[in-house]
Amino acid sequence: MTANLEMDAEQIRRDIVTMIHHAGSGHSGGSLSAVEILTCLYGAVMRHDPGNPEDSCRDRFILSKGHAAPALYAVLSHYGYFPKEELMTLRCLGSRLQGHPCRDCLPGIELSTGSLGLGISAGLGMALASGISGDSYRVFVLCGDGELNEGQNWEAFMAMNKWKPHNLTVIVDYNRVQLDGTAQEIMPMGSLRDKIQSFGLKLSAATAMMWTS
């Protein structure tokens, strides 16, 4: 499984670079930094079925850092949600693959994103909704470290501590880079670990190299 994931990730990286180059625009850094995370989720962790993307028991994934859409598109294509050839329509007029994910355009997209800071709140709502509907699913949210400049994220962390959803996982892509500078230059946060733990949330850290050890 590990070897397969590594090969999947390598191909997905190639697809991201190719599609962004073909489009002539796109967020390459934020997309490439998310490859290992997305490959692990879709290739080994999440319960999902490309043949039945609306299955009520499917695990949900929210790309809160919506500018990394090329990474999500490449992963969805790789795992069978739509033909790989469609990747070359990224950002084209009338394409289903726009600059940010659109819920109504493409199978496998759970939430239209792009305006930063909304994904954790939406994921919390989805996770709590499973207790109401009786459906058994997990929710995974991927946000960027620069995205945590948005105050709504911290309100969502506070709400997570109150409601304590057992089926919600928030992943921070801690790449230390934002659109026009480093995260440290733009808005120093100090210890992200200490801040998150201060909300009473369980936290663990991983690096891309861990899956090869």
Task: Place the predicted regions along the sequence by residue.
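Cofactor-binding active-site loop characterized by glycine-rich and histidine/acidic residues
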Residues: 16-19, 31-162
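N-terminal start-of-chain detector that recognizes signal peptides
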Residues: 10-11, 34, 112-113, 140-143, ...
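Globin-like tetrapyrrole-binding proteins
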Residues: 27
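N-terminal hydrophobic or amphipathic helices/low-complexity stretches enriched
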Residues: 1-12, 16
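Thiamine diphosphate
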Residues: 6, 21, 92-104, 122, ...
